[in-house]
Amino acid sequence: MQKRLTLLGSTGSIGDSTLDVVARHPERFSVYALTAHRNGDKLVEQCLRFAPEVAVVGDAATAAHVEAKLRAAGSKTTVLYGPQALVDVSASDGCDTVVAAIVGAAGLAPSLAAARAGKRILLANKESLVMSGGIFMDAVRDHGAILLPVDSEHNAIFQCMPRDENEHGGISKIILTASGGPFRTREPATLADVTPDEACKHPNWVMGRKISVDSATMMNKGLEVIEAHWIFGLPGERIDVLIHPQSVIHSLVSYRDGSVLAQLGNPDMRTPIAHALAFPERVDAGVDQLDLAQIAQLSFEKPDYARFPCLALALKALEEGGIASAALNAANEVAVEAFLERRIGFMAIAATVDAVLNALPNRSPNGLDDVLAADADARRLAAGFIAKAPAPRVERIV
């Protein structure tokens, strides 16, 4: 039976990759809704190609622009805007599958709506679990939703996991791999001089600017550890991080008998997306087959927490529980935005997050409102710290 998709964040890198896979299998997948924030022109192009029933954008002005262009082209796609519209298309009877690819906290409400509507959720928005892991997973279980991870690391672990629920099938630990980003071998003393363009030059993956910076700080890997904790139900001490510069092994599962299962593939997000879209079947993702002889060498090393303090901060937040992870995520989003706008230096990202975690009293959230309040408090504190931070030492355009 053909799957009907709502694609949240269709104009981003995950959205592009998802639509590439969808286009290869029109007999399997059709598009009910596409959403974007302000990239209206790209959304129009996608709507004209995939003919969704609904398109959602962030504001009225973008909606008017998109609707005018669609009507001029003869499209009948309905154009909506605003946060509630995102929630509505995620819970709509018009779709059975929701690809949650909105970056950041903005993706929480529609992802949670999809869970409460019992949808099949392909989760690329790790912030939903980082901010409200217990609430989100309860919604998945209580409403019969199906959660399939799209992040390459979590999808790799999912593929290496046993399909039964018996004590996780004898699992000892799971191991998330990380490329180490563009600054893995750079002298730590020079990191204060990093520019946004340098931070966004990932050695292996094609990603958006925010997640590229998160990869450079390794905050992305820290968020993925928190995400893995909630998806797979393992404590932080049974989730390891391993630097693997080639990005060929996407993650590993270590079993009690000494066996280690790994998922390998070329670094292309279409592979985990195609796996999740078609699961439990397999379909062509348009990705070249892996040639290990050509790669010749795979290397590994432990992460340097002094070089990557954001990773240490994320692990600490997971250990502390409560609202710490939500505060971590919010402070990081504000700090990364400030860095990309050249208002703070690269190392000030970790300093801002650390300051917020120290300033905000931890507490156990009683519900989503508490999580959102913690998010708002952390953003306010982060903005205050950034306003007092010194300007970047170097302003280079690379």
UniProtKB/Swiss-Prot annotation:
Asked if the record carries the keyword Coiled coil, the reply is: no
Which top EC class is given?
Answer: oxidoreductase
Task: Quote the catalytic activity from the record.
Answer: 2-C-methyl-D-erythritol 4-phosphate + NADP(+) = 1-deoxy-D-xylulose 5-phosphate + NADPH + H(+)
Required co-factor?
Answer: Mg(2+); Mn(2+)
Pathway(s) of this molecule: Isoprenoid biosynthesis; isopentenyl diphosphate biosynthesis via DXP pathway; isopentenyl diphosphate from 1-deoxy-D-xylulose 5-phosphate: step 1/6
What EC number is given for this enzyme? 1.1.1.267
- What residues bind 1-deoxy-D-xylulose 5-phosphate, as annotated? 126, 152-153, 179, 202, 215, 220-221, 224
- For this UniProt record, give its keywords in alphabetical order, as a comma-separated list: Isoprene biosynthesis, Manganese, Metal-binding, NADP, Oxidoreductase
Q: Which residues bind NADPH?
A: 11-14, 38-39, 125, 127, 208
Keyword check for Manganese, yes or no.
yes
InterPro entries listed in its UniProt record: DXP_reductoisomerase, DXP_reductoisomerase_C, DXP_reductoisomerase_N, DXPR_C, DXPR_C_sf, NAD(P)-bd_dom_sf
Matching entries from Pfam families are given as: DXP_redisom_C, DXP_reductoisom, DXPR_C
Residues reported in the UniProt entry to bind Mn(2+): 151, 153, 224
GO BP, one annotated term:
isopentenyl diphosphate biosynthetic process, methylerythritol 4-phosphate pathway involved in terpenoid biosynthetic process
Alphabetized SUPFAM superfamilies for the sequence: 1-deoxy-D-xylulose-5-phosphate reductoisomerase, C-terminal domain, Glyceraldehyde-3-phosphate dehydrogenase-like, C-terminal domain, NAD(P)-binding Rossmann-fold domains
Q: Which GO terms describe its molecular function?
A: 1-deoxy-D-xylulose-5-phosphate reductoisomerase activity; manganese ion binding; NADPH binding
Q: Which family does it belong to?
A: Belongs to the DXR family.
Describe the function of this protein.
Catalyzes the NADPH-dependent rearrangement and reduction of 1-deoxy-D-xylulose-5-phosphate (DXP) to 2-C-methyl-D-erythritol 4-phosphate (MEP).
UniProt protein name: 1-deoxy-D-xylulose 5-phosphate reductoisomerase
Origin species, per record, is Burkholderia vietnamiensis (strain G4 / LMG 22486) (Burkholderia cepacia (strain R1808))
